[in-house]
Amino acid sequence: MEENKSINSRFENLEDRMLFYRGRHEQHLPRNSYVMIMCDGRSFSQKIKKKFKQPFDSVFIDAMNDTCAYLCSQIQGAVCGYVQSDEISIFMTNVQTPESTLFYDGRLVKLLSIVSSIATSFFNKKMMEYSINGIFNESDIKNAISEAPLYQFDCKCWDLPSLNDVMGWFLFRSTDCTRNSKQQAAQTYLSHKELMGKHTDEQIELLKEKKGIDWHTEYNDGEKYGRIIFKEQEHHTGTFNGKTVEYERSVWKSHYNKDLTIPENREWLLEIIKRSGVDFSCDSVSRNVTNMLDESYEKAKQIQSDLTLISDINEYFPNELPLFCEEFDSKDYISKLQELRSDIKKLKQVCEKDDES
């Protein structure tokens, strides 16, 4: 109650007070940052299984690609998009000058609500076109529209510290796409009992063995690795003042993605991003991003291995654990870890000798 009185005393009129309430939890993305926007289909699984062919349906894939392309055309600063399953990722930035601002000034609430509503409305439009395609009777069209499911997308948004991390996100989602693609293909033709306990690579081997369907050759790269959407120039010919003129027009188009676990294919994607017209020269990581990715995965593996030490630290040096966690992201992390590893090794040796005696 006292807090409300204090707030009320700051404002001379109702409008200012209401606007204060509306905006006091407003969040902004930082200026000149690399931003990833992700739209994810809400409860798509059952709707897709009922309406579309399995494991992949070109109508659904085209609708997702078109939705991503349309989103990119509507988002100021969009660099490229990635589509897999019912998921869209869009890389957005504006790093040209210190004064550059992001889409909707980086206001998270505004950005998330606008992007999710654009994705939802456009995708439903594409689905409606598909539902009434080839129907000419008015009552049948009305029935098709009334029976058509409504699709919704949620939206998430976050900033990334470097182009290296942008590439890492696309690799992460592409790897997930490949795993899902293998599972979808196997689950379409094989029973749950046949697939139980098998890794995805084992599943597609079984699919080839039992059904003669080779995942590697049966499906295109877009179905296996997702699709990349980026802007490219189209050559056009038209008439102006009675004269034939030629001109270029920028359009957002979808292309099959490649296996991004292969370094050469990551270089291919990096070149697409760099051709977007955005100046990445300020990002020192971008100069050697593919090698940096390889190095970061090796470091990630090492960190994952190092994390197994936490239980030992907690057992032998419980007072050190909070300090260790605080320093996990610092430059002193490696040296601290090596020191603790050495101490734990010595202590374990002492404990083993005590046990023997």
Q: Which residues does each PLM region occupy?
A:
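Regulatory and interdomain segments flanking nucleotide-handling catalytic cores
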Residues: 1-357
